[in-house]
């Protein structure tokens, strides 16, 4: 389970005997965290599985199975919807592979390190301004190192999420000769 400590705390706080806990990430091969502080605070695994196309598909199937078990009357609907969603994601995956097959540049930079599964799935290299959990502001040293990385790897776009400070993304983009593109 990718979010075990968080899920257990939430379930205990709910104090609801009828609550069904779904391990949406069951069967996933997790991206392991390497920063000891992040592991201590958040657990051993990157929780952003849904940002992988295959991870999102797996989670949808696990959720559908749990819903079907809890609500057998509508089980077929849950399962069909999950299969349809998985098929749509498979189309996206094939298109992504086709569109990036000849890409010489495999590096990208984001506001926070949420795309580890996507990077793993498609042989990409992710760098980020902030850590996996978008906590704290980056140091000037970190921004300088990222700017150097961007120039070396010809990274022309810094992807910035809503949760991350736009100032850091703008500063990095200016230093690296790149542009900032918002992602949601």
Name each model feature, range by range.
Residues 1-184:
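Extracytoplasmic metal-acquisition and chelation regions
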């Amino acid at each position: 389970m990718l979010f075990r400590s968080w899920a257990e705390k939430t379930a205990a706080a709910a104090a609801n005997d009828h609550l069904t806990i779904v391990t949406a990430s069951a069967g996933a091969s997790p991206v392991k965290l390497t920063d000891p502080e992040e592991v201590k605070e958040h657990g051993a695994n990157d929780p952003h599985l849904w940002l992988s196309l295959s991870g999102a598909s797996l989670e949808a199937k696990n959720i559908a199975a749990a819903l079907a078990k809890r609500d057998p009357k509508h089980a077929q609907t849950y399962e069909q919807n999950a299969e349809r969603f998985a098929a749509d994601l498979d189309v996206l995956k094939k298109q992504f592979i086709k569109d990036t097959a000849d890409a010489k540049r495999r590096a990208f930079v984001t506001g926070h390190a949420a795309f580890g599964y996507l990077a793993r799935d498609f042989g990409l290299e992710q760098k980020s301004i902030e850590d996996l959990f978008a906590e704290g502001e980056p140091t000037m040293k970190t921004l300088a190192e990222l700017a150097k990385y961007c120039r070396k790897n010809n990274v022309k776009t810094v992807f910035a999420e809503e949760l991350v400070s736009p100032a850091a993304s703008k500063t990095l983009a200016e230093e690296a000769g790149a542009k900032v593109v918002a992602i949601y």
